[in-house]
């Protein structure tokens, strides 16, 4: 503050000296002497005050900073053993992917890890499962209808009672005998021979089913003998053996 006052007085002295120096030149006009002096003094004082206020503001700003710094120094603790704050930790940048792998490989690896942790699998993974994989997953074995290319032996292992004969139309007669204890249906196999049907049906085959059977075969099948009308080409001796009273004269 003392410096500011000294500066203001110095400025005021210089201004007054200039004012009186200019007033000496105007001594020829005494009527305007007072007016000129006071007007010039007023202007000089106004300029001096403006300059002093501007300089005082700048000094106050510098002084305020010094006072603030002094206050900071005075606020420090007298104890020098206080713990210093820890240094700031270095922030590690988050790695989006490893430098050795490309972003596509990193995303693929991340997806695999996510599926392994959550137990999720893609649709392609399920479509690629084979029959052996399904057997391991399901203890009872796969569904035979689901795998239409399964063989007869695979279905026997899956179903204890054996496969359905209708499901495998190419099964042979021997395979059906093993599946069904009573034997196959004679009508189902049109190409079965007479000997095969005798083994399948104890009473023997139906004579009507085999029209090409001979007279001897029909005698073995029917104890009473064949019908004479059924064999029109029988001879006279054959009819005698068939009818004890002899043949009908009208018939021959």
Swiss-Prot record:
Transmembrane helix is among the record's keywords: no
Tissue expression remark: Highly expressed exclusively within the dorsal esophageal gland cell during syncytium formation in host plants.
Family annotation (InterPro entries): CLV3/ESR
Location of this chain's protein in the cell: Secreted; Host cytoplasm; Host extracellular space; Secreted, Extracellular space, Apoplast
GO cellular-component term (any): host cell cytoplasm
Glycosylation sites: 32
Compositionally biased intervals (Basic and acidic residues): 125-137, 144-179, 186-200, 207-242
6 X approximate repeat A: annotated segments: 127-219
Main localization category: secreted
Keyword field contains DNA repair: no
Gene Ontology MF terms in the entry: receptor serine/threonine kinase binding
Signal peptide: 1-21
Keywords for the protein's UniProt record, in alphabetical order: Apoplast, Differentiation, Glycoprotein, Host cytoplasm, Repeat, Secreted, Signal
PANTHER family listed in its UniProt record: PROTEIN CLAVATA 3 (PTHR36349:SF2)
Function of the protein: Mimics host plant CLE extracellular signal peptides that regulate cell fate. May play a role in the differentiation or division of feeding cells (syncytia) induced in plant roots during infection.
Protein name: CLAVATA3/ESR (CLE)-related protein 4A-2
Taxonomy of the source species: Eukaryota, Metazoa, Ecdysozoa, Nematoda, Chromadorea
